[in-house]
Amino acid sequence: MDVTHESLSGLEIPILKIHQGQIANGKYCAFVIGRQHPGESNGSHVLKGSLDRILSGEEFSLKLLKHCDFVVIPMLNPDGVIAGNFRTSLFGKDLNRLFKAKDTTLLPEI
Protein backbone atom coordinates (compact mmCIF):
# COMPACT_ATOMS: atom_id res chain seq x y z
CA MET A 1 0.00 0.00 0.00
CA ASP A 2 1.16 3.47 -0.80
CA VAL A 3 0.35 6.45 1.38
CA THR A 4 0.52 9.52 -0.79
CA HIS A 5 -2.05 11.74 0.87
CA GLU A 6 -3.17 12.83 4.29
CA SER A 7 -6.57 13.98 5.45
CA LEU A 8 -7.25 17.45 6.84
CA SER A 9 -6.39 16.20 10.35
CA GLY A 10 -3.24 14.45 9.14
CA LEU A 11 -4.53 10.87 8.96
CA GLU A 12 -3.02 8.67 6.28
CA ILE A 13 -5.13 7.86 3.22
CA PRO A 14 -3.74 4.57 1.90
CA ILE A 15 -3.85 3.69 -1.79
CA LEU A 16 -3.73 0.07 -2.89
CA LYS A 17 -2.58 -0.73 -6.44
CA ILE A 18 -3.51 -4.17 -7.74
CA HIS A 19 -2.13 -5.46 -11.02
CA GLN A 20 -0.79 -8.61 -12.60
CA GLY A 21 2.80 -8.17 -13.72
CA GLN A 22 3.75 -4.67 -14.80
CA ILE A 23 1.20 -1.88 -14.97
CA ALA A 24 0.71 -1.64 -18.72
CA ASN A 25 -0.66 0.81 -21.23
CA GLY A 26 -3.67 -0.53 -23.07
CA LYS A 27 -5.17 -2.17 -19.99
CA TYR A 28 -8.27 -0.82 -18.33
CA CYS A 29 -7.86 0.79 -14.92
CA ALA A 30 -10.63 0.73 -12.33
CA PHE A 31 -10.44 3.44 -9.66
CA VAL A 32 -12.36 2.28 -6.57
CA ILE A 33 -13.17 4.52 -3.60
CA GLY A 34 -14.51 3.38 -0.24
CA ARG A 35 -15.97 5.35 2.67
CA GLN A 36 -16.27 8.63 0.82
CA HIS A 37 -19.45 9.06 2.84
CA PRO A 38 -18.38 8.07 6.36
CA GLY A 39 -21.79 6.77 7.46
CA GLU A 40 -22.00 4.20 4.69
CA SER A 41 -20.17 1.51 6.64
CA ASN A 42 -21.71 -1.25 4.52
CA GLY A 43 -19.45 -0.02 1.71
CA SER A 44 -16.41 -1.24 3.66
CA HIS A 45 -17.84 -4.77 3.73
CA VAL A 46 -18.65 -4.70 0.01
CA LEU A 47 -15.17 -3.39 -0.80
CA LYS A 48 -13.50 -6.08 1.32
CA GLY A 49 -15.53 -8.79 -0.40
CA SER A 50 -14.63 -7.36 -3.80
CA LEU A 51 -10.94 -7.23 -2.93
CA ASP A 52 -11.05 -10.79 -1.58
CA ARG A 53 -12.48 -11.94 -4.91
CA ILE A 54 -10.00 -9.96 -7.02
CA LEU A 55 -7.07 -11.30 -4.99
CA SER A 56 -8.38 -14.87 -4.73
CA GLY A 57 -6.25 -16.30 -7.53
CA GLU A 58 -9.36 -17.93 -9.02
CA GLU A 59 -9.71 -18.18 -12.79
CA PHE A 60 -12.14 -15.25 -12.86
CA SER A 61 -9.79 -12.95 -10.94
CA LEU A 62 -6.76 -13.92 -13.03
CA LYS A 63 -8.65 -13.13 -16.25
CA LEU A 64 -9.84 -9.85 -14.76
CA LEU A 65 -6.32 -8.81 -13.73
CA LYS A 66 -5.01 -9.71 -17.17
CA HIS A 67 -7.16 -6.93 -18.64
CA CYS A 68 -7.61 -4.48 -15.78
CA ASP A 69 -5.47 -2.81 -13.11
CA PHE A 70 -7.06 -1.48 -9.92
CA VAL A 71 -6.34 1.59 -7.83
CA VAL A 72 -8.23 1.34 -4.54
CA ILE A 73 -8.67 3.92 -1.80
CA PRO A 74 -10.31 1.89 0.98
CA MET A 75 -11.22 4.95 3.09
CA LEU A 76 -11.19 8.35 1.38
CA ASN A 77 -12.71 10.20 4.33
CA PRO A 78 -11.11 8.91 7.57
CA ASP A 79 -11.74 12.20 9.38
CA GLY A 80 -15.47 11.95 8.75
CA VAL A 81 -15.49 8.31 9.88
CA ILE A 82 -13.72 9.12 13.16
CA ALA A 83 -15.93 12.19 13.75
CA GLY A 84 -19.05 10.08 13.23
CA ASN A 85 -20.28 12.21 10.32
CA PHE A 86 -22.75 10.66 7.91
CA ARG A 87 -21.92 12.38 4.60
CA THR A 88 -19.30 15.02 5.25
CA SER A 89 -15.61 15.51 5.93
CA LEU A 90 -14.12 17.07 9.04
CA PHE A 91 -14.55 20.42 7.28
CA GLY A 92 -18.28 19.73 6.78
CA LYS A 93 -18.08 19.18 3.02
CA ASP A 94 -19.57 16.33 0.99
CA LEU A 95 -16.49 15.07 -0.86
CA ASN A 96 -18.71 13.37 -3.43
CA ARG A 97 -19.64 16.82 -4.74
CA LEU A 98 -16.14 18.27 -4.85
CA PHE A 99 -14.06 16.26 -7.33
CA LYS A 100 -13.33 19.40 -9.34
CA ALA A 101 -12.24 21.32 -6.23
CA LYS A 102 -8.87 23.03 -6.45
CA ASP A 103 -8.35 23.82 -2.74
CA THR A 104 -5.97 21.12 -1.55
CA THR A 105 -5.48 22.92 1.77
CA LEU A 106 -9.07 22.45 2.96
CA LEU A 107 -9.79 19.39 0.81
CA PRO A 108 -6.57 17.33 0.68
CA GLU A 109 -8.57 14.12 0.23
CA ILE A 110 -9.67 15.24 -3.23
PLM feature spans:
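Non-catalytic propeptide/linker segments at domain boundaries
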Residues: 1-3
